[in-house]
């Protein structure tokens, strides 16, 4: 899907991901709901730092990146995550980015492990190393149609560690909703003696404190 998406962007004019008007990937009208700030919330003891609140515009950008593989949408998410990393990490030399992996079925459908691909690009841009150390060890359902308790049950015990994860670990995901994914990823690290000191996402659907 990825090569086709990149070819289509060469053939068809660019449109705003929010309202589909011809022009830049995010137009001035939609920019008001896609303007990275710095939000903080908690998932158990894990502090989650995010750039944006979940809005209809944010939803469209996630879908354009995740399901359509559009580079312009990828770039918006990457820039949002880098914005928060710049705000929340004083010394990048100590930290390692741990991406949340996609399921095997999602990887086959999309042609990539979505967040792993984003974090690889973030690592190249920032110089912060990535450790791709997590994998889903069993089949899980698509989280989008599940409620809070169903999400937690769906992911319980689903992540395993496939390589050591040393350093100051930061979990990276595109969006935090109920926190079930980040909670399970942190559990998998903790079970092998490693610890995530925090998490960064582009978008939060949780009640979050805006810091700046």
Across the structure, where does each feature detected by a protein language model lie?
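Glycine-rich phosphate/pyrophosphate-handling loop used in enzymes and phosphotransfer proteins
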Residues: 1-212
